[in-house]
Design a protein with these regions (language model features):
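Conserved helicase motor
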Residues: 34-43, 115-119
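Short, structured surface patches at the beginning of a domain
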Residues: 19-20, 38-51
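Class I SAM-dependent methyltransferase SAM-binding "motif I" and its flanking Rossmann-like core
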Residues: 75-133
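Glycine/small-residue-rich loop that forms an oxyanion/phosphate-binding "nest" at active or ligand-binding sites
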Residues: 45-90, 94
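A contiguous loop/helix-start segment that scaffolds small-molecule binding in enzyme catalytic cores
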Residues: 32-33, 56-57, 136, 140-242
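Helix-loop-beta element that forms the nucleotide-linked donor phosphate-binding surface
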Residues: 18-27
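Short, small-residue-biased leader/transition segments that mark boundaries at the very start
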Residues: 4-7
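Alpha-helix capping/helix-boundary segments
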Residues: 12-14, 95, 145, 204
């Protein structure tokens, strides 16, 4: 793939990476055009794009990780689809899959929740969803809010096993695996740096209780669905449109 233009999230980091490639493989990127493409300017960039922009190869790349996964990029892909511009996706480093494999949890299913909202009821309800899931839950978190998340996990589920990894595949990569309580006590006494992935042990199931997600797809009358759900929960009332 030859590069004509580049749309990195931030040009400074991408130029560093390309300079390393240029030195190793005797390439020349000095005449290439670089334009930042991120959440703050993507609407303006897309408004000015035309098919002529893509008569030669244009590469969109992220600083780390993979575009469109808790990073900008989906709007650019959609623009290409709507305007019939051919495109390819070349898989890159992905913190979600790497952290899931590193965690040691034996579950074969996981749910990716991205970044939680900074505060408010939406954050609280999403965290409840993570903790009540029967699948491994995976979150991204910044160094400034990691301790807050651990404090919340400690208050709600102090004995829940949590796996943490920071700076995946980088020089300062480090992992932790312990109960929410122990991790909170350990990390509150150190300076937290780097980008983190948080992997949450799934909620343990007892017996054969069905959850709402198990009952809704069943090909039975709505009234029967409601009765089955109430029989399994006793405390939850769910209204089905009949």
């Amino acid at each position: 793939l030859s590069l004509h233009d580049a749309l990195p999230i931030y040009t400074r980091v991408t130029k560093k990476l390309l300079n390393l490639l240029a030195l190793k493989y005797e390439l020349d990127f000095s005449q290439k055009e670089f334009k930042s493409f991120h959440s703050h300017n993507e609407k303006e960039i897309l408004k000015n794009l035309t098919k002529d922009t893509f008569t030669k190869n244009v590469v969109y790349c992220s600083d780390a990780g993979m575009p469109c996964i808790s990073d900008p990029g989906a709007s650019l892909v959609d623009w290409c689809i709507q305007n019939e511009v051919p495109y390819d996706v070349i898989p890159g480093a992905n913190a979600i899959l790497t952290a899931f494999a590193m965690s040691g949890f034996s579950s074969t299913e996981f749910t990716f929740f991205g970044f939680l909202d900074h505060k408010g009821t939406s954050r609280a309800s999403k965290l409840e969803e993570v903790l009540n899931s029967s699948r491994v839950g995976i979150l991204y978190e910044s160094p400034h809010r990691l301790l807050k998340l651990l404090e919340e996990l400690n208050k709600k589920e102090p004995d829940r096993t949590i796996f943490l990894v920071k700076e995946i595949s980088k020089f300062y990569q480090k992992t932790y695996k312990n109960s929410a309580k122990n991790l909170y006590e350990e990390l509150k006494s150190i300076e937290i740096k780097g980008e983190w992935v948080v992997v949450v042990e799934p909620k343990e199931k007892f017996g054969f209780n069905l959850e709402l997600d198990d009952i809704l797809p069943l090909d039975i009358a709505p009234k029967i669905k409601a009765r089955r759900f109430l029989k399994n929960t006793y405390t939850n009332l769910v209204l089905f449109r009949i």
